[in-house]
Amino acid sequence: MEIRFTTEKPTLVNNLTIVDGLTRSGKFFLGKIISGLNNIEFFQYSFTLDYLPYMARLGAITEDGAISLLRAVVDQNCYDRSIGRNLNLRFDDRSSIYNSPVFDKYILRSKSEYDRKKIVEFLSDKDQIFLFVLHNNLANANIMFNAFPSLRIIHLLRNPVDLVYSWMKKDYGKIKLNSKIDLFGIGIDPAICGRNGPLPWYVYPIKSEYESIKNQTDRIIASIQIIIDLCRKTFKSLSIDYQKQIMFLNYEHLVENTNEAIDDISEFLGTHRSKFMNEIIVKENCPNVIEVEQRTKKRNKILSEATNKYCEILETLENKYVENSNFF
């Protein structure tokens, strides 16, 4: 007997927004900025919301099961936050509630009695925005919109030279994993099977090519290229209405023209700045100037380590980004 999970069950949360982008694009920085707008709960990170969409895409879980679980995870996480449960209190985590100017509000919730009816009303309030920061979610946005039709996504873009260099600094793309520390370094998220060990899910379209790459920097460039390609194809496959629910934002614009970027975000989300926004901007050292000379040094370092084929791929990606301010 076939069992299906319902995808019609109503959710508690009615106003969900996701900050998305490639790894090292500055999403948590953006999450802190957006959390300074009115009627927005300080952002959360959920590894389950990161994993489920691509596992459904690759057939590891049925779509109805994934949708049902995605909705349950959002509702549970937001419910827990509303009563002060499972708060991230680690000081040096970017998603720690101590990064919120009203962190005491969240701590107070954990000490207070709560009225279930009022909690449900709060979660269901269409003017109350609940914010999550995720990775590479645009690549699987179709299932996210199936789960949350009113979802809004703010996808953060960044110069690919900065991305590649940052991945190099993090030692991503290792050819051999010689220890559990190496394994942890590539992330503990569910990986697909490769000939010689686990591989990141997003390389599945180029799995054979990726495994044949013996240069770590080449692997990083190939990874970033395929993620961008997956995001682009998924975006173009969405209906016009869903495309309008996605905002593209450049990291460089956010850093250098912070107030203008905040105004654009506010309009997209239908809210406005809280009284804490100026404090947050100052704390994040914005607005600031991105030094072109530093990017030149990064580019030279990358080009000195990558092979010609992947140097050309990076050059193509960067030229498109500089000319169009996006990859789409």
Predicted regions and their residues:
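Conserved phosphate-donor/acceptor-positioning beta-strand/loop module used by diverse small-molecule
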Residues: 133-136, 144-170
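Short aromatic-enriched loop/helix-cap "lid" or pocket-rim segments at secondary-structure transitions
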Residues: 53-57, 166-169, 175-176, 261-262
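PAPS-dependent sulfotransferases, especially Golgi type II membrane carbohydrate sulfotransferases
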Residues: 1-18, 195-328
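PAPS-dependent sulfation machinery
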Residues: 45-132, 193-206
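Walker A (P-loop) phosphate-binding motif
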Residues: 7-35
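PAPS/PAP-binding and catalytic site of the sulfotransferase fold
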Residues: 26-39, 144-148, 167-168, 248-273
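Short beta-strand segments
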Residues: 21, 131-133, 155, 248-251
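Long, charge-dense
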Residues: 174-203
